[in-house]
Amino acid sequence: MADSPPNDHPDCFHQAALDEAVGRLVSIIRRERPQVIITYGDDQRGYPHPDHLKVHDISVPAFERAGDAMWYPWAGEPWQPLKMYYSVWARTRLIAVHEAMLAKSGKSPYDDKWLNRPGQDERITTRIDVASHMSARSGALRAHATQVDPKEPWWFGLNDDELATAYPYEDWVLAKSAVGAPDADVVEIDLFAGIEEVIALEHGQSFPGRLSSPALVETEVGEVA
C-alpha cells in the first residue's frame, strides 16, 4: 500500500514512467483492437491501492490516444475503442452479502467500518447478471492465492450458489463512450450495448429509432463530484 517500502522500488509498477506505460498499453490496444475496455475507477478512496491507481492513470489516456495517429506512431495502426467502464463495488452488494452471511452462520466479516462507508451505487450505469458464471469468478480469485486467501470469509464466506442468490451482479460505471450513453433512468445489462448499431451504420445499415447518425460523439458520464 501507499508509503510501504516496496512502492519505493524503482522497478515496481507504481513507479513506472507514465508516458512509457501509456504507450505500451496503446500498442496492445492497437494490436488486439478491443471494442470495450474496463479499468479501475477514478474514485478509489475506499481502497487506494497504488497499483489500482496506476492502472487507472494509464488506461484512461491510453483509451483516448489509441485512435489518434499523432500519439505513439511506433505503436501500430490507430484503433479507437468505443467504450470504457470503471469497476465499482456497490454498497448494495456489501449489504446483501453481509445479510446472507448472517443468515447462514450468524456472523459476517463486515463490521461497522465497512457497513457505514458510503458507496458509489448512484454512479452505476451498468449491471451484469453473472449468476451462471460465479464458479469462474471465484475460481479466478482462488488462482491468486498470494493476493486472496482462499479460506478468507471476506471473499469466500458464501459458496457460488449462495452468492448468486444474494447478489448475482457485477456493477460498472460507463466512463467514456463513443456510442452514446443510456438514459439516466436506464441501467445497461450489456457492456457491448450500442456497439452493434454503430458497426451496422458504418456498413450502411440502419436501426430506426435507435441511432440516427453514424457520427461518433464521445460522451463522459459518471464523474465524481
What residue ranges belong to the model's regions?
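Metal-dependent de-N-acetylase/amidase catalytic core
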Residues: 3-11, 15-224
